[in-house]
Amino acid sequence: MTQPSKSNETKNNGTGQPCEVATAMFGYHLLADPILNKGTAFTNDERHEFELHGLLPPTISTLDQQVSRRLEALRGFGTDLERYAFLRDLQDTNETLFHALLARNIEELLPIVYTPTVGAGCQNFSRLFRRPRGLFLSIPHRKRLKDILANPHFEHTEVIVVTDLSLIHI
């Protein structure tokens, strides 16, 4: 397998406006990146260029089609906590699809990603945790905070939420 040179990938930013993103990622690594993964929306040319054939179902779908499928799947869950976990998994795998689904169904989904369900999500964090997302600082690591904050992964942090989780009640 040869690594493609930096190529542009056309992404839909969730509003219907395409934008191009330069990336050297390909194959499974591209699909594992929630920012760059477009799921079944990769075109045949993109699938060839980024070595995705065989890693995705052969059918190419628009963002609208993906949103419809995910909404149908979401509505099939029995509880809001299950729907919350489903949406967190979607956010961890395909942020474009997550944000499009949320934006197009905000009245229905806001109570799931925010109050009241987010409280239950926090209370069940250990059970629902799938992948690291964010920055975790804890008392046992207080002497290493400078080293933790120096991690290059946190260079582009835009939002910080601080909580001790003590006020989350259902």
Task: Please give the residue ranges for each predicted region.
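Basic/polar N-terminal segments that are highly enriched at the extreme N-terminus
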Residues: 1-37
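Conserved, well-structured core domains of diverse proteins
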Residues: 26-28, 35-135, 154
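Short coil-to-helix leader/linker segments, especially the first N-terminal amphipathic alpha-helix
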Residues: 133-143
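Short beta-strand segments
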Residues: 138-140, 160-164
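Short alpha-helical segments and helix-capping/turn motifs at coil-helix boundaries
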Residues: 142-152
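A general structural motif
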Residues: 156-158
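Conserved small/polar residues in nucleotide/adenosyl-binding loops
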Residues: 168-170
